Structures are given as structure tokens and as C-alpha cells.
């Protein structure tokens, strides 16, 4: 079926969402809707493609470039190494078969979260990630708890504010692209 995705920065689509039985995902400090940036979803690759984890690592490095503004090649290398480790601790490797448990694709509860990565980092990277784990942006440190299989999904980014809107936009664009 046809899927519709709407990014709503001004909460203009709430009434329409109710009329169309759309899912509204509100992202922000007071929200109870969470999207885990570490989720790997089965729909995220075409059938003939392989490499779920490699694809996800590239997307995560892009996301962390937003958080850290700029990273050295050494920082990117450290970050990639630690990302691989947090997935390995969840039993997920570059072998796509590790994403299946009892012949079903692993759920969001089987995926790492930001805190898992934070606990592996040291120094400057760890310090810069702290607000996303324990501070005002800790709503990004949760397992996904929203239904993503609706044909109409509205991403409410009203609460994010000017400084943090880039994180919400990235998360939703990646989610919708998948």
C-alpha cells in the first residue's frame, strides 16, 4: 500500500491524524513516544542487498556527526569500533543471520541504545554524548515504543526547539527512508 509520512513542526496535523487514523510520533522531552536510533529494521534493505549492520553503522556515524559537529578520523574510528561492540553484545554481527531469533527478525528490545555506547566511550566523546543519555535529550536513549506499520505516520517535532530539530529531522528522515 501507499505510505504517507509527514513531518509536522507546528502541530498542524493533529486533527487530520485523528480523522485518518494516522500514527502520531511526538519527539521531545515530555513525549512518551520513543524512536531508538540504533534500531535495525527488516524493511531497511532491499531483498537482494546484504549488510544490515554495515549500513546501520554508516547511518549512525552520520547521526553522530550531527551531535559532535565535527569528528576527527580517529574519533570516527573509535566510534565505529564501539558501535560494533555494542551490537556484538546484543548478538548482532556483520552476518545478517544474527539479526534473526527463532526465525523472526529481532525486535527493538534486542537492539542497543545510546547508553550502551556511552558506557563504552571515554573522554571527549563520552562528555559530549552525556546530555543524550542523562540530560535534556535523554528521550533519545530509549527503545522504540511506537507502532511504525501504519500507512500514515506524522512526526511531531514541535517540542524539539531550534537547536535540537536537526536530531529529530535526521531520526525521522532515516526512519521514513527505511
Put a short name on every predicted segment.
Residues 6:
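Short beta-strand "acidic-cap" motif of Rossmann-like dinucleotide-binding folds
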Residues 9-178:
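P-loop NTPase motor domains
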Residues 1:
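Glycine-rich phosphate-binding P-loop
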